Amino acid sequence: MVEGRRRRRFSLSSQQLALLLLLLSFFLCFSVASPRAISDSDLLDETVANSSSSVASLNASSSSSLVKPKEGSFADIIDRALEKEFNESDQNEVADPGSFNNSVAGQQAVLETVARVKSTKKNETKEEKRFQLHDVFNLNNDNRAEDTPTLIDRKDNVFIISNSKSKYPVLQLDLRLISDLVVVIVSATCGGIAFACAGQPVITGYLLAGSIIGPGGLNFISEMVQVETVAQFGVVFLLFALGLEFSTAKLKVVRSVAVLGGLLQILLFMFLCGITVSLCGGKRSEGVFVGAFLSMSSTAVVLKFLMEKNSTNSLHGQVTIGILILQDCAVGLLFALLPVLEGNSGIVHGMLSIGKVVVLLLSFLAVLSILSRTCIPWLLKLMVSLSSQTNELYQLAAVAFCLLVAWCSDKLGLSLELGSFAAGVMISTTDLAEHTLEQIEPIRNLFAALFLASIGMLVNVHFLWTHVDILLASVILVIIIKTTIVTTVVKGFGYNNKTALLVGISLAQIGEFAFVLLSRASNLHLIEGKLYLLLLGTTALSLVTTPLVFKMIPAVVHLGILLKWFSPDSTIEKGEIVRSESGKQRMILMSRQSHSS
């Protein structure tokens, strides 16, 4: 018995000695290093294999030294019962299809060295840091849960572990993501309040708040990819709410300019930019891409502005929305066009890809049209009957339906925006469209603010300030060219000067989706690095200045009246519907009915 106690004490002292040596090695590493943050190159010298083997040996030594309860005691009975219930196969990790070996073998992965970064605690450092404002947003609480590990490869790419393996199922929290979301939402709220008090559009406050806290500003956000992914729900719910307010009767009035005019303005941009670049001695493929890039407008920003001004039901608002929806439908076509412009795939292959997208789009819309007439009314009535006491279930069902249709659209190679808008249009054909809109509005407003703030985070303030001269000139040129082309196209469909000009100004910016299009073209080596930076900065500055352009619309309208471009008594809601013979007949019929009543 005494010998057993001695062995137990010896095992405990050896464990303590191992831990002491481990802490001493960490202390020596930190004492040799400089007091600054550990760089990636310093960390890359350690391999994952060595670190994992040391941790495994430490776990083995600690598990072998566990004190077992006394034989025959109540604790021993419980211990044996637990061992019988939970055997070794349940406790050990089982290799699943996503394990390391299967991933390497099945996906032709390349084994490379990465560094695993963990946050240091206060008692592990010898020197105390000075207080910085950035430390307020760092999670340095000793009582918090374990921070999410970070991996860095040799190219300085940072990866956040999404599913850390554990012997037992435990609740995993990404506290940095929670902190980032809190910072973004609070900053967007403060920015919106400040600009609302100043009488300015709250959109500007959201964008400016995002640029301040983003990597180009104070760099308060750690997980950009995760925050931007969550913020993408803002576009989804914005277009879902737009679809709920959509009217097929109003669409029939503007469908020609929305479909044909939207396609015409995209083709005009591609043709003019391609010809201009060819005349200047550049690559025609780059010019065509720049034209497609410039033709895209910001759906989220424009819709937010129209909703704030209650202009979604106006004629120029309906035309603007129709063209924006057409641009969202053309996203898949533009993606299919990029390999053709790059030159690796032939024209025939490119045409087949575009034809495939068109067939998928038409088939998808046909299936949704059938479902909207058969299943959707019955499903909504069922949700209403089940939500008699509270609207919680109906609200959840509406959100789930929107996300499901958007997900299906994305899986078919179309866009999330198109799917979410189609989901709203499906419900708009029923009697519960207004009720659904009331339930979805709070969620839409929250995620819309989050999305606009995430757009602001893409703006690098230092980069914009360094190249403000050329970027500002590029933005002014984009505004003038887009306003001129869109106004000319809308005017060509029989609309008067005022409506055409308002539509042109509303679409005179580069959309946030252009970031995705630009990154895809860069990966295909379709454009050079200098052009990439120019387009990136122009897009960012264009989104920031868009609310200011919207603020100038009343002044532009007043100037148009002074220059007699359009009559002062023309309205947006009624008088401008007279654009064709059928429109004139409808207006005459309405006036006769009003006189007879």
Curated annotation (Swiss-Prot):
Gene source species: Arabidopsis thaliana (Mouse-ear cress)
Record field: pH dependence: Optimum pH is 5.8.
Phenotype of gene-disrupted mutants: No visible phenotype. The triple mutant kea4 kea5 kea6 is compromised in cell wall biosynthesis and has small rosettes, short seedlings, and is sensitive to low potassium K(+) availability and to high salinity (e.g. K(+), NaCl and LiCl); it also exhibits a reduced luminal pH in the Golgi, trans-Golgi network, prevacuolar compartment and vacuole. These phenotypes are partially suppressed by the cell wall-derived pectin homogalacturonan trigalacturonic GalA(3) in the dark but not in light conditions.
Entry protein name: K(+) efflux antiporter 6
Induction: Down-regulated by high K(+).
Catalytic activity annotation: K(+)(in) + H(+)(out) = K(+)(out) + H(+)(in)
Keyword flag Protein biosynthesis: no
Gene: KEA6
Signal sequence, start to end: 1-35
Keywords of the record: Antiport, Golgi apparatus, Ion transport, Membrane, Potassium, Potassium transport, Signal, Transmembrane, Transmembrane helix, Transport
